[in-house]
Curated annotation (Swiss-Prot):
<keyword id="KW-0547">Nucleotide-binding</keyword>
<feature type="compositionally biased region" description="Acidic residues">
    <location>
        <begin position="324"/>
        <end position="338"/>
    </location>
</feature>
<dbReference type="Pfam" id="PF00270">
    <property type="entry name" value="DEAD"/>
</dbReference>
<dbReference type="GO" id="GO:0005524">
    <property type="term" value="F:ATP binding"/>
</dbReference>
<keyword id="KW-0347">Helicase</keyword>
<feature type="region of interest" description="Disordered">
    <location>
        <begin position="549"/>
        <end position="574"/>
    </location>
</feature>
<keyword id="KW-0698">rRNA processing</keyword>
<keyword id="KW-0378">Hydrolase</keyword>
<comment type="function">
    <text>ATP-binding RNA helicase involved in the biogenesis of 60S ribosomal subunits and is required for the normal formation of 25S and 5.8S rRNAs.</text>
</comment>
<keyword id="KW-0067">ATP-binding</keyword>
<feature type="domain" description="Helicase C-terminal">
    <location>
        <begin position="235"/>
        <end position="455"/>
    </location>
</feature>
<dbReference type="GO" id="GO:0003724">
    <property type="term" value="F:RNA helicase activity"/>
</dbReference>
<dbReference type="InterPro" id="IPR050079">
    <property type="entry name" value="DEAD_box_RNA_helicase"/>
</dbReference>
<feature type="compositionally biased region" description="Basic and acidic residues">
    <location>
        <begin position="565"/>
        <end position="574"/>
    </location>
</feature>
<dbReference type="InterPro" id="IPR001650">
    <property type="entry name" value="Helicase_C-like"/>
</dbReference>
<comment type="similarity">
    <text>Belongs to the DEAD box helicase family. DDX56/DBP9 subfamily.</text>
</comment>
<feature type="domain" description="Helicase ATP-binding">
    <location>
        <begin position="46"/>
        <end position="224"/>
    </location>
</feature>
Length: 574
């Protein structure tokens, strides 16, 4: 969800006035700077407002899907004179996206806040505060499916959803892949599904998994599939570089220290330890970066995203644990192809994979979250599926802006040669790359190989070796604990203070150095001889500098000057 869309997505022939929206809503839209509706908005809004149709919409990232369902919801509430009650429920897959949608709805209500109340259930409210807010019967509730069901089961008598007129599920495919289908089935018993319930199902991809939700919640829906991928095709450039396990860190050091990428970068890693190892490695060279992962408190995660969008941070190391959700599906597809190739060959039954991560289930950064003006997505660790790759690179080249995606790929022959820098999922990098290239070529995209000039990079290797040796497993564990303690303090104890003093929130930074066990301050400066000639600065000639100081010259220079006026030997008296 982005607050603005590219001109390639705009429908110049349609104006906001043509939708007969409430004047207060039109004023808020104008304040947001929306000149014209996008293609998805000009198609969905009339169907929702005039024909009262259920809508299943597929549109690419940055095309304005969030506004396409939020504007009809707000407009209907502004013109609704019925009794107070919960009228609309918006479900999203992650807490980050829940907060993002909440902020956008608040902007649409700038000139009508007294009439409509909005509640974000995914915020870190205490049970007592949440119950008091629910008693007021907010018109719009925004939540993840699991959180909503949890609250409904605890407060079934106090929450009445019989007045709900609209149900929206955003990023449907991700909601289903997160395992929320059971929660959505439970929700059916609380909602007036058989009455006049309008449903919006929004996603960047539409597949067969939607059939169950379609049968449960939709009645003769309008299905919108807008092929807008070609709009971004010329704006996104994709590269991959084959490298060794340690050279990933070496290349990251060279790229960020020499500022080879102009603009903001998101570096994706596949687990939390990996993120802290990269941060500890880079900070020894004075490269400031912040970490985003599922262990951090929700308030800290939201603040990091906000500050990144405000250009406070230029390098964000994001842990993408959700990419493992699609690994099994890719393996199954690959297994089907292998079966066809082998013909009558025997196939062993595949063991079911168990989920290994124990972090916040409602965390997600590779999909839906509005990272603004990202120049580059660096897949420091290649994702484990082609679907996860598409979600990651969708963080750049958004809303018609240019972007680049660079992926480090480990050849199978290099796997396991550097144990400290090794990653288990990298063993399948070449296999996954093949799937990614195949998938992207189907969509008309090309992934080009990128060759680094290793002769120029080689001079930095000894410095990278020194820095990497300092990042031990103990240092990673200590940094992880230290970061978590700091963020818990910032998130809980200072929350009320920052609400009363918002100007002091700017001083709260998430990119402070965590410091490994051994600090090497000399690594922060790059000697001129290591830099390529084009990057070297002209050094002024200060003349000959002797190795030793000329003490004789210094002695003669002081000769001839008078002694002190008072000589203690001569002035001494018996």
């Amino acid at each position: 969800m982005s607050t603005s869309a590219s001109s390639s997505y705009l429908d110049d022939e349609t104006t906001w006035d043509s939708f007969n929206l409430d004047p207060r809503l039109l004023q808020a839209i104008d304040q947001l700077g929306f000149s014209n509706p996008t293609l998805i908005q000009s198609s969905a809004i009339p169907l929702a407002l005039e024909e009262k149709r259920d809508i299943i919409a597929k549109a690419s990232t940055g095309s304005g899907k969030t506004a396409a369902y939020c504007i009809p919801i707000v407009n209907n509430l502004l013109t609704d004179d019925s009794s107070q009650g919960i009228k609309s429920i918006i479900l999203v897959p992650t807490r980050e996206l829940s907060n993002q949608v909440f902020q956008f709805v608040e902007k649409l209500l700038t000139f009508s806040t007294n009439k409509i109340n909005v509640l974000n259930l995914s915020s870190s409210y205490s049970d007592q505060v949440l119950n008091s807010l629910l008693v007021n019967k907010p018109e719009i509730i925004i939540s993840t499916p699991a959180k909503l069901i949890q609250i409904l089961e605890k407060n079934e008598k106090n929450i009445d959803l019989s007045t709900v007129k609209n149900l929206t599920i955003d990023e449907v495919d991700l909601v289903l892949s997160f395992g929320y289908l059971d929660d959505l089935k439970k929700l059916e018993s609380y909602l007036p599904v058989k009455k006049n319930l309008q449903t919006f199902l929004m996603s960047a991809t539409v597949n067969d998994d939607l059939d169950d939700l379609k049968q449960r919640y939709c009645t003769k829906p309008a299905i919108l599939k807008l092929n807008e991928d070609s709009a971004n095709q010329n704006n996104l450039v994709q590269y991959y570089a084959k490298t060794t396990e340690f050279d990933k860190f070496l290349l990251a050091y060279v790229i960020f220290k020499l500022n080879l990428i102009k603009g903001k970068t998101i570096a994706f890693v596949n687990n939390i330890d990996r993120g802290y190892r990269l941060k500890l490695f880079l900070e020894q060279f004075g490269i400031r970066c912040c970490i985003l992962n599922s262990e951090l408190p929700i308030n800290s995660r939201l603040h990091i995203v906000e500050e990144f969008n405000k250009n406070v941070y230029h390098l964000l190391i994001a842990t993408d644990e959700t990419n493992e959700l699609n690994e099994e599906q890719d393996d199954d597809e690959d297994g089907d192809e292998d079966t066809k190739d082998k013909g009558n060959a025997e196939t062993k039954p595949k063991k079911s994979k168990k989920s290994k991560f124990k972090q916040d289930k409602e965390y997600g950064v590779s999909r839906g979250v509005d990272f603004r003006n990202v120049a580059c997505v660096l897949n420091f660790d290649l994702p484990t599926s082609s679907k996860a790759y598409i979600h990651r690179i969708g963080r750049t080249a958004r809303a018609g802006k240019a972007g680049m995606a660079l992926s480090f790929v480990l050849p199978l022959s290099e796997f396991g040669k550097h144990k400290t820098a090794s990653l288990a999922s990298a063993k399948k990098d070449e296999k996954v790359l093949g799937r990614i290239v195949k998938q992207q070529s189907k969509n008309g995209f090309e992934i080009k190989p990128y060759q680094f000039d290793m002769k120029q990079v080689e001079g930095f290797r000894y410095r990278a070796d020194d820095a990497f040796r300092a990042v031990t497993q103990t240092a990673v564990r200590e940094a992880r604990v230290k970061e978590l303690k700091n963020e818990l303090i910032n998130s809980e104890k200072l929350k009320r203070f920052f609400e009363e003093n918002p100007q002091d929130l700017a001083s709260l930074r998430h990119d402070k150095e965590l410091h490994p066990a051994r600090i090497q301050s000399q690594l922060k400066n790059v000697p001129q001889y290591l830099l390529p000639e084009s990057a070297r600065q002209d050094v002024k000639n200060i003349g000959f500098v002797p190795f030793h100081k000329n003490k004789i010259h210094k002695h003669r220079k002081g000769k001839g000057k008078g002694r002190k006026k008072v000589d203690p030997l001569k002035s001494f008296r018996k």
